[in-house]
C-alpha cells in the first residue's frame, strides 16, 4: 500500500510540474504576441502622413482605423503619379461628429 501511495504522489508531482511548465510556455507565447502587437502599433503610419508604399499600415483614429486615401498627381513633366496619405473618410468623420455631439449632450 505504501508503494502505491509513493507512486501516486510521484505521478501527481510530475503532472503538476509538467502542467506548470506548459502554462509558463503559454504565458511566454502570450507575452511575445503582445510585444509583437505593440511593435506593430508603433510602426503604423500616423494620420496625414504618406502611405503610398504601405496602404494597409495606417494607425487607428479616435473610433476608426484611418484609411489610405490616394490621388493622382501630375508633375511638371506631365507624368502621373499616385500619392497616398492616411486620413479619415467622410463617413467616418460624420460618425465621429455624431458620437462627439452625443457625448456632449448626454455627458
Swiss-Prot record:
Keyword check for Iron, yes or no: no
Per the UniProt entry, the propeptide covers 21-41
Q: What molecular functions are annotated in GO for this chain?
A: toxin activity
Q: What is its main location?
A: secreted
- Identify the GO cellular component terms for this protein: extracellular region
Q: Which residues form the signal peptide?
A: 1-20
* Entry comment describing in which tissues the protein is expressed: Expressed by the venom gland.
Assigned keywords, A-Z: Disulfide bond, Knottin, Secreted, Signal, Toxin
Q: List the disulfide bonds.
A: 44-59, 51-68, 58-86, 70-84
Domain note:
The presence of a 'disulfide through disulfide knot' structurally defines this protein as a knottin.
What's the protein here called? U1-lycotoxin-Ls1m
Amino acid at each position: 500500500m505504501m508503494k502505491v501511495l509513493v507512486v501516486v504522489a510521484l505521478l501527481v508531482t510530475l503532472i503538476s510540474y509538467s502542467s506548470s511548465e506548459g502554462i509558463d510556455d503559454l504565458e511566454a507565447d502570450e507575452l511575445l504576441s503582445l510585444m509583437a502587437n505593440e511593435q506593430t502599433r508603433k510602426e503604423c503610419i500616423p494620420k496625414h502622413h504618406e502611405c503610398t508604399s504601405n496602404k494597409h499600415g495606417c494607425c487607428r483614429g479616435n473610433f476608426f482605423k484611418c484609411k489610405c486615401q490616394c490621388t493622382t498627381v501630375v508633375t511638371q513633366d506631365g507624368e502621373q503619379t499616385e500619392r497616398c496619405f492616411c486620413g479619415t473618410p467622410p463617413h467616418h468623420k460624420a460618425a465621429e461628429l455624431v458620437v462627439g455631439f452625443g457625448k456632449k449632450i448626454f455627458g
